[in-house]
Amino acid sequence: MTLSEESHLPKHVAIIMDGNNRFAKKNQMQKGDGHREGKNSLDPIVEHCCTRGVQALTVFAFSSENWNRPAFEVDLLMKLLEEAIHEQLPRMRKFNIALRFIGDRSKLSEHLTDLMTHAENETAHFTSMTLTIAISYGGMWDITDAAKQIAKDVSDGIVDIEQIDTHLFGRYVSLNQLPPVDLLIRTGGDYRLSNFLLWQAAYAELYFTETLWPEFSIDEFDHALAVFAGRERRFGKTSEQIQQDKIEN
């Protein structure tokens, strides 16, 4: 089989876009310039995912923990996020991509949340791919929020407590209308998930690279896809069972 075959291509790719500040320091730039370079690095990856046939791309733009950064950097990141949304809309129309956002919107400015809602509404009918940007997001927040929603539905008589299982719980977390994450890529050299998509990436293949996000290229993205294609995904089964399933199917 070739990499281009659907069985070898991840349906859902997630990326922790790490390394902007280190890129700026490495190149004797201001922090803001590093983040701006990182913003620009997303565009070719989005287009490439769409042309390759990836169904969903989810990127970590601003975490729950990022609120702890210096105020000037948070303000800069919020401004860049607004710029990115404005810049992405024409690309979404051109490539027929739906744009979505996940995260705790209660901490965001009204202007930014209105812009996010507008972008979602403008692209809701596009079907080639779904690009999701995680802003003010944390996996633990996501799971806790889902638990609160379930508790309310139990209290309101909508859900019986005996109905609660992983399938039902999964309907309450973010990205519940998308396939589970197949491949999670982290740039920047750290080897951790940093509280990103803890539920959705439970069975994801992980690809870590020392490459800083502003330097992450389409060639390395394709290498990550090739690594993914070479892995055997067992989901608790043995290799023998997987081989037998392939024969039978």
From Swiss-Prot:
The active site is at D18, N66. One of its GO terms (cellular component) is cytosol. SUPFAM superfamilies: Undecaprenyl diphosphate synthase. GO terms for biological process: cell wall organization; peptidoglycan biosynthetic process; polyprenol biosynthetic process; regulation of cell shape. Its EC number is 2.5.1.31. Mg(2+) binds at D18, E205. It holds the Pfam family Prenyltransf. Binds 2 magnesium ions per subunit. Its cofactor is Mg(2+). It catalyses: 8 isopentenyl diphosphate + (2E,6E)-farnesyl diphosphate = di-trans,octa-cis-undecaprenyl diphosphate + 8 diphosphate. Substrate binds at residues 19-23, 31, 35, 63-65, 67, 69, 186, 192-194. Belongs to the UPP synthase family. Homodimer. This is Ditrans,polycis-undecaprenyl-diphosphate synthase ((2E,6E)-farnesyl-diphosphate specific). It comes from Acinetobacter baylyi (strain ATCC 33305 / BD413 / ADP1). The lineage of its organism: Bacteria, Pseudomonadati, Pseudomonadota, Gammaproteobacteria, Moraxellales.
